[in-house]
Design a protein with these regions (language model features):
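Structural microenvironment flanking redox-active thiols in thiol-disulfide oxidoreductases
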Residues: 56-101
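Short active-site neighborhood of thiol/selenol oxidoreductases, capturing the structured segment around
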Residues: 41-61
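Bacterial N-terminal signal peptides
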Residues: 7-17
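A short beta-strand-turn-helix
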Residues: 26-46
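Positively charged n-region of N-terminal signal peptides that target proteins for export
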Residues: 1-7
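Thiol-/selenol-based redox modules, centered on thioredoxin-like
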Residues: 127-162
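Short, internal strand/loop/helix patches
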Residues: 79-81, 96-127
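Short, small/polar residue-rich loop motifs at catalytic or cofactor-binding pockets
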Residues: 22-23, 126-128
Length: 162
């Protein structure tokens, strides 16, 4: 193996591993059609992001949101990320946004119509709900999969930076 090839075979996997844990640059509209950028969301505060891509995701987000609002420190930003790439073309986007407004009126829910940000942030395909914790710089600290339970809530809270 050449002197150049060996360092590259080591560097590329490391670069991908680091990229998977850091928030990617994005601009997505929320359910109110307000644009949010990666810089807006990760603006010097810890972020708990609830994400999913199934029909029941808004219900699961609502349950997590309620529990997080009770137990997470007020300095933590709680946001949703809805992967909507699988929505059939004939379903009006406005009906999905209205449903999100109704279920999560006081929470930013980013609408990822192409599923690219969802994938780049490392959320699993086919997930009803996953909850990730990011530090103030957008570094992912961990992901908890599944509906809210006391055990999963404890896992999420343990991931929050001090």
């Amino acid at each position: 193996m050449s002197r150049i090839a060996l360092p590259l075979t080591i560097a590329f996997p490391l670069a991908f591993a680091v990229a998977a844990n850091a928030a990617t640059d994005f601009t997505l509209d929320d359910q109110y059609e307000k644009p949010h950028t990666q810089a807006d969301i990760f603006a010097g505060k810890a972020v708990v992001m609830m994400a999913g891509m199934e029909r029941k995701t808004p219900d699961a987000m609502q349950a997590w949101n309620k529990a997080l609002r009770r137990k997470a420190p007020p300095t933590v930003l709680v946001v949703g990320l809805s992967n909507l790439e699988g929505v059939p073309f004939f379903v009006p986007k406005s009906s999905i946004k209205k449903a999100l407004v109704k279920q999560l009126p006081n929470t930013i829910v980013l609408c990822d119509w192409k599923g690219k940000t969802y994938a780049k942030l490392g959320f699993p395909k086919g997930s009803t709900i996953s909850v990730a914790v990011f530090d103030a710089h957008g570094e992912r600290l961990g992901v908890v999969n599944g509906p809210v339970t006391d055990e999963r809530m404890a896992q999420v809270l343990a991931l929050l930076p001090p």
